[in-house]
Amino acid sequence: MDEIPAEQVVLLKKAFDAFDREKKGCISTEMVGTILEMLGTRLDQDMLDEIIAEVDADGSGELEFEEFCTLASRFLVEEDAEAMQHELREAFRLYDKEGNGYITTAVLREILKELDDKITAEDLDMMIEEIDSDGSGTVDFDEFMEVMTGE
């Protein structure tokens, strides 16, 4: 379960608990198909049986939370860094209306506000000040990437 990000474990726990109606710490393997469909994956019965056999290590016909996470982690698409960078480049391009390679700090402020409606004006000011250290009022793609990925 180490490879699953903590926030996804929380979501998986909620889903697991929703299917664990009797609150006994396990769910029936018959629910697996339904759960996978909810995660956006549809499998034929043979494939489903094969996955269940692999994941239900103790052959109990029930999945404990740990087994459920093992199963779910196979279908949680972890975006690789390259795909993420591509998506962020596209987003940047959309906001860079003049195509000059930068956006204004005002536009960045709007983007950040859209991403997190709970962010305060003070937090925004601090972030913008940190990003736009030269006070130019603009942000290039590298600076934008730094903000969006925290790297």
Swiss-Prot record:
Sorted alphabetically, which InterPro entries does this protein's record hold?
CALM/Myosin/TropC-like, EF-hand-dom_pair, EF_Hand_1_Ca_BS, EF_hand_dom
List residues binding Ca(2+) 1: 56, 58, 60, 62, 67
Record flagged with keyword Calcium: yes
Keywords, alphabetical: Allergen, Calcium, Metal-binding, Muscle protein, Repeat
Pfam families, per this entry? Answer: EF-hand_7
Annotated Ca(2+) 2 binding sites: 132, 134, 136, 138, 143
| CDD domains per record | EFh
Residue stretches making up the EF-hand domain: 7-42, 43-78, 83-118, 119-151
One term under GO cellular component:
myosin II complex
List the GO molecular function terms. calcium ion binding
Q: What does this protein do?
A: Troponin is the central regulatory protein of striated muscle contraction. It consists of three components: Troponin-I (Tn-I) which is the inhibitor of actomyosin ATPase, Troponin-T (Tn-T) which contains the binding site for tropomyosin and Troponin-C (Tn-C). The binding of calcium to Tn-C abolishes the inhibitory action of Tn on actin filaments.
UniProt lists the family membership as follows: Belongs to the troponin C family.
Name this protein carries in UniProt: Troponin C, isoallergen Bla g 6.0201
Q: Which organism is it from?
A: Blattella germanica (German cockroach)
